[in-house]
Amino acid sequence: MNIAIIGATGYGGVELLRFLQHHPHVHHCSLYSSSQDGIHFSESFPHVGEIEGAILQKIDVEQMADECEVVFFATPPGVSSTLAPTLIDKGVKVIDLSGDFRLKDRSVYEMWYKRQTASDHYLQQAVYGLTEWNKEDIQKAQLLSNPGCYPTAALLGLAPLVKERLIEEDSIIVDAKSGVSGAGRKASLNTHFSEVNENVKIYKVNSHQHIPEIEQMLKAWNERIQPITFSTHLIPMTRGIMATIYAKAKKELSLETLLDLYKTSYEDSKFVRVRKPGQFPATKEVYGSNYCDIGVAYDERTGRVTVVSVIDNLVKGAAGQAIQNLNVMMGWDEESGLMLAPIYP
Amino acid sequence: MNIAIIGATGYGGVELLRFLQHHPHVHHCSLYSSSQDGIHFSESFPHVGEIEGAILQKIDVEQMADECEVVFFATPPGVSSTLAPTLIDKGVKVIDLSGDFRLKDRSVYEMWYKRQTASDHYLQQAVYGLTEWNKEDIQKAQLLSNPGCYPTAALLGLAPLVKERLIEEDSIIVDAKSGVSGAGRKASLNTHFSEVNENVKIYKVNSHQHIPEIEQMLKAWNERIQPITFSTHLIPMTRGIMATIYAKAKKELSLETLLDLYKTSYEDSKFVRVRKPGQFPATKEVYGSNYCDIGVAYDERTGRVTVVSVIDNLVKGAAGQAIQNLNVMMGWDEESGLMLAPIYP
Amino acid sequence: MNIAIIGATGYGGVELLRFLQHHPHVHHCSLYSSSQDGIHFSESFPHVGEIEGAILQKIDVEQMADECEVVFFATPPGVSSTLAPTLIDKGVKVIDLSGDFRLKDRSVYEMWYKRQTASDHYLQQAVYGLTEWNKEDIQKAQLLSNPGCYPTAALLGLAPLVKERLIEEDSIIVDAKSGVSGAGRKASLNTHFSEVNENVKIYKVNSHQHIPEIEQMLKAWNERIQPITFSTHLIPMTRGIMATIYAKAKKELSLETLLDLYKTSYEDSKFVRVRKPGQFPATKEVYGSNYCDIGVAYDERTGRVTVVSVIDNLVKGAAGQAIQNLNVMMGWDEESGLMLAPIYP
Amino acid sequence: MNIAIIGATGYGGVELLRFLQHHPHVHHCSLYSSSQDGIHFSESFPHVGEIEGAILQKIDVEQMADECEVVFFATPPGVSSTLAPTLIDKGVKVIDLSGDFRLKDRSVYEMWYKRQTASDHYLQQAVYGLTEWNKEDIQKAQLLSNPGCYPTAALLGLAPLVKERLIEEDSIIVDAKSGVSGAGRKASLNTHFSEVNENVKIYKVNSHQHIPEIEQMLKAWNERIQPITFSTHLIPMTRGIMATIYAKAKKELSLETLLDLYKTSYEDSKFVRVRKPGQFPATKEVYGSNYCDIGVAYDERTGRVTVVSVIDNLVKGAAGQAIQNLNVMMGWDEESGLMLAPIYP
């Protein structure tokens, strides 16, 4: 099968390529870049070496539609909402790693993103690709909206609690910590090594665009869920997200009950691993892999549940989950091309 | 004035020395170490160079009592509770950077620290050295118990809210992130570079010994305060603590009111700097200095206050605050020897 | 095929497992540990998850000989020289990642390692596994001595120059920079995060045990080679070695000639990639992979050649090259199980 | 005394301010910025807090000449060569941290910097501010050209060997490793955290503009010195330079002789510290301070001397040495305002 990657020279794009190069069902990737067309991919990323035919091409939607069955967008806001409709109309499958199709309500999108997005027609047919919980819809999707990195970590951690209605609906707080690669490859003072190293920063306090994305899914699971508090911190590391999640239990719980619930919820999910009592995952334990590792605690003193959910933001939080969704959409083994162990240390 | 440092070869000790070397009222520091007596300090720490008389001495309480007016303990649990009483009885002033004298209730200490501590007699006379809020008692103290690094960041961030009773008493959550130097200089797998770098870990979930220390002070300010949720994360950096604090407002607040309260609360405190609306401090902005920087947000969607409080764990969280307390105890300018600007970048 | 790993809980061991898990010709790995036998591997390394049968076993050479065709030693000095002879005598193939069998001359070993090693009988039959240059001998080896991390980077960078006798024999200087994982997983002050982070250190000046290993191979290629200067620096990163190599050209050279030589030397080597004129590799460009990337410069002002050679110390510098040697020893495709792309960023 | 800083919002500028704020002889610093005039300095650098009068001003040379006795340039190439002549002509003292006035020969400047610089008139009166070795000239200087960071580390390490003619004149190789802050505060892909972290890069191979600066000084000390090999590596840390220096001894030396020479050479230099036999400095041991620490080795096997010289690139390699030069120019104590101990860890 031929696939195309638009935005191949960003971190999401290069990570898609890392996995797709060894994917058993993908024969060829065409790489597109609006800024670097004409040059060989290895000029930007010498680590990939000499891949045959890896010349970056100018974005040409018509050509893509002729040559490829699936197109991945690993692009900044506003690109996929502009280009994807033509591809959709021509019958191409689209997997969008940007936020353009994630929010069903355009006014919510505009409020949080401060810009316009696609028309309702396309927004409504977009399927939200949180693979573990939306598999049926994903199987039928033509337009797949891949979740944000933070929402992936937060939602996989919250799902069992929210669906089972074990926690107070107005008590959810997510304190998230992310590596720097989540900010993309564009150079800025915020990603300057000397500003990030030996430093922890909070950013976009109460205003991160992933807040409505998380709430939309939580409300789909339990309509009573109230607005959440969600904070994002920049940590001096390249990869990894940890979401530390706090919520008040409706009634007294036991750690055993909680862990049973999580184990059961994810027993068929190859990529979600629940830790033993008293053990919690570190981000490095999923480094470079598609795993989401989860640890759970219950505190009798406060009646609060603490859930710790970690992912590699570029894999399960972006390229890996996108390929997982590709696998589901095509009816392939969900794990195809994704069974790489984390790199440790 | 002559002072002594016990535990001079730990990170707390070497940081005490960095500031005391240039302190206008301190003439000589005697350095004591149980493990390295007889060698010159610069053997362990070449960065200090040739300081005259910096031979590490064997711990001898009698000799100290003869030669020094003030003794600093920068030691592991159990040392100061054993040695300080003799010094106290001989009229020496003691400033203890360990946790031995922080909790007034011995049973609480034993539950969280899993060991015994000093007798009630000494516990009761120990003054808790959160300088900004306990100045009157500190002026009269002979035995000063210097706050823990996390409690310093958390309490300075919480004080105005709790004292003014603006928040629900059962709603406090503190999500804290710390650099590795907080774990001390002892080598262990937990501080191994290859295990810490490119990694975020949560540890001691719901069981950190700083929880009762924070709660003790909060209850002294407002007896209705309920048990808090307090989480600690290890971040791949050497210095710095950020406490991200969440609490539910009792009634609707405005950011303006909140910032006014914080500005007023700390207007006489040289070392606490409150940020402008919409601005939040990063740990690097206090690096190497005795500052605690604070930013505040109020979220109308959730009715929650978010407070971000950052310190250098080895300075305001340890050696710096200890010297600030020394200054207050001796009646000197509170800032003596401490007015070093943060190092940036 | 069944294989065994002795020293499975070190960084070399866990990296062997990462690659062997997906190796097409390896059916089962038995894991041995002298310090942690009886526990499941995932207790030490949660990132690997639930691998069936990954209980760490007590080292039992007889049992290994019965069950396994190949035994890997990823052990500290002195272990393989003690245990390997029995395995060899029983016909088992041994691949040793330690330095025990690398030096042919016992007195040289004793001078640099300050300890004794195996008897001459076994030393002489050991084949040095610098795969790209010793393939014929490796194919016939029963006892394979895997090169050190530094020697791998240095020798692959020097080989074409030395074999073609293009450089003055007394002019070789290798300035090497290594990540911390090269020091192993044992906790020590030298690997403490707070001591390594924001720091560069030189160590073992003129006394590193890899010096005789490099010289032995260089002299095998050109007996006139004189003692080299070789310096090792500890860099605040987990993985990666860069060897910056300096040597005086015997006569004027051109960059074109040099690059032709390198391209030709390695044209059949999948894992050695030579950069274009003016381009030099960074360690991150081989991260997690078995590649050795090389860049070359010639300076007309000084008449010196500069070669920059980078590897991942745990892969091409240890586990990866060991598996590459396994592949050659067994007559399999040299790349089997090793074609993972570097992780970037 | 009033001084001015042009380019106050770069890393050199902010570091000048850190030291000058506490300088006993400096009463007021005026801060100038071409890009951010009109805003308060703390908007760019919240860590400095509320300094009275720290509004960034538009560059106005006439005004500066009226108000200030000394002007520091911490600016990109081309600024000081344009603006300084007016100040010089008006009798203002100028200390230039850029490279504009470092090379006496304009054609050499143009070859290495690929741009034009000041006229011969000003180049010839500029005094090169390697304080330890040029003190007499510095005392009389009106235009002081502050050395580059790499040349400072390299020259302080080489001086005793070159002046005493102990080494072969064509044998000098300097392998330098630098933290990222040396590249300035401008955002670029080369300083992006995700590209720098877990990575070592070599850059400007055989073409760094500091090469002629080092050679010019070496030749002033010994006219027979031949072109040197000088390599620069980017290391994942914020501050610090290590220069590892290799040279062939003319005749057999002893470590004792060498160390005696270094100790004697620097016995009157407060800021150069020579290590004991067998000990070598790490960059962290001078962090945030004006020290240059030096270790020396002699290898009998190769007849080569290895010198390890470390500085904080922003202090002794920039702002600190500039203030040291200010002190000498004004006849003040050379250490005024500079006696801060390194921060460790």
Swiss-Prot record, chains A, B, C, D:
It is an enzyme of class 1 (oxidoreductase). Its EC number is 1.2.1.38. InterPro entries: AGPR_AS, AGPR_type-1, NAD(P)-bd_dom_sf, NAGSA_dehydrogenase, Semialdehyde_DH_NAD-bd. Pathway: Amino-acid biosynthesis; L-arginine biosynthesis; N(2)-acetyl-L-ornithine from L-glutamate: step 3/4. Keywords: Amino-acid biosynthesis, Arginine biosynthesis, Cytoplasm, NADP, Oxidoreductase. It holds the Pfam family Semialdhyde_dhC_1. Its main location: cytoplasm. Catalyzes the NADPH-dependent reduction of N-acetyl-5-glutamyl phosphate to yield N-acetyl-L-glutamate 5-semialdehyde. This is N-acetyl-gamma-glutamyl-phosphate reductase. The lineage of its organism: Bacteria, Bacillati, Bacillota, Bacilli, Bacillales.
